[in-house]
Amino acid sequence: MAGSIVISKEVRVPVSTSQFDYLVSRIGDQFHSSDMWIKDEVYLPMEEGGMSFISTESLNSSGLSIFLATVMRARAASQAEESFPLYENVWNQLVEKLRQDARLGVSGN
């Protein structure tokens, strides 16, 4: 069973089950305590619905910006891991798709 990180209705990052588990774990560990509401919202389909996806669709620009910053912290922390090269491509895809989201006002950059 595979998973997905949904950015918007049209944009998602499809991942294998192992990639999904890896990303969700690493990203989840990097939320600041003041931003846990964002984690709760994004992780809701997985935590309460038992689904194999997380979604940023409902976040406004501020929430998405915080999520991107959290992803960047998680990616940086993961670089020290021996397994990082196995996941580097999927990290890059996720960061690129988040940065292109119109809610961040940097579409196309």
From Swiss-Prot:
CDD domains: CdiI_BpE479-like. Transmembrane segments: none annotated. It comes from the Bacteria. Signal peptide: none annotated. Specifically interacts with cognate toxin CdiA, which inhibits the toxin. Immunity protein component of a toxin-immunity protein module, which functions as a cellular contact-dependent growth inhibition (CDI) system. CDI modules allow bacteria to communicate with and inhibit the growth of closely related neighboring bacteria in a contact-dependent fashion. Neutralizes the toxic activity of cognate toxin CdiA (C-terminal 160 residue CT fragment) upon expression in E.coli. Does not inhibit toxic activity of CdiA from other strains of B.pseudomallei. This is Immunity protein CdiI. It comes from Burkholderia pseudomallei (Pseudomonas pseudomallei). The lineage of its organism: Bacteria, Pseudomonadati, Pseudomonadota, Betaproteobacteria, Burkholderiales.
